[in-house]
């Protein structure tokens, strides 16, 4: 378990000291969602009344958070894991959208106020980004990184381009090995 948590801490760029607490927080939230889903699955009459409404609210909430696809069923809640939860954090979404070269750099950009959602400047790397907020994620208005000519942005584009080329080379070599 400890090795697994250290691996998650490295992969998602969590704090070096106290990063385990962030993982435990996500595991705790996941456990609450799963317990609620298991309670609803165990009910015989979950199709009408209060339980139907509770089930619908749970599914809508998790869909809005980006943890489930629309049209999912209560059983799908049990398939969510900690990595799904960690990948919905602001820090991870900033990295996946290409605004930072690494998870740690994404955390640094957020903490120093260079990232905003809409007009709201965000400084909490652990904030869970809703699906509808993903499109409005960008650099802050007062951030020097907003300028596409900034050396950081140029270096970021170069790094992304190199990663894409490396992936293409790996795909080509694996295709040749299969032939």
Pin down the residues of each PLM region.
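DNA-binding alpha-helical recognition surfaces that contact promoter or target DNA
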Residues: 108
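Beta-rich strand-turn-strand
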Residues: 100-104, 112
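Ferredoxin-like alpha/beta domains used as RNA- or RNAP-binding modules
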Residues: 1-97, 116, 120-179
């Amino acid at each position: 378990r400890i090795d697994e948590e250290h691996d998650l801490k490295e992969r998602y760029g969590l704090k070096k000291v106290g990063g385990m607490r962030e993982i435990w927080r996500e595991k705790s939230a996941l456990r609450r969602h799963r317990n609620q889903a298991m309670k609803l699955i165990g009910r015989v009459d979950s199709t009408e009344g209060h339980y139907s409404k509770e089930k619908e609210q749970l599914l809508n909430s998790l869909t809005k958070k980006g943890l489930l696809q629309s049209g999912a069923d209560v059983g799908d809640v049990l398939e969510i894991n900690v990595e799904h939860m960690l990948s919905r954090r602001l820090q991870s979404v900033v990295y996946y959208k290409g605004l930072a070269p690494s998870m740690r750099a994404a955390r640094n950009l957020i903490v120093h106020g260079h990232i905003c959602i809409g007009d709201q400047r965000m400084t909490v790397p652990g904030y869970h980004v809703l699906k509808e907020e993903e499109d409005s994620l960008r650099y802050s208005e007062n951030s020097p990184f907003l300028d596409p000519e900034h050396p950081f942005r140029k270096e970021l584009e170069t790094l992304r381009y190199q990663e894409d080329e490396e992936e293409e080379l790996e795909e080509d070599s694996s295709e040749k090995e299969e032939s």
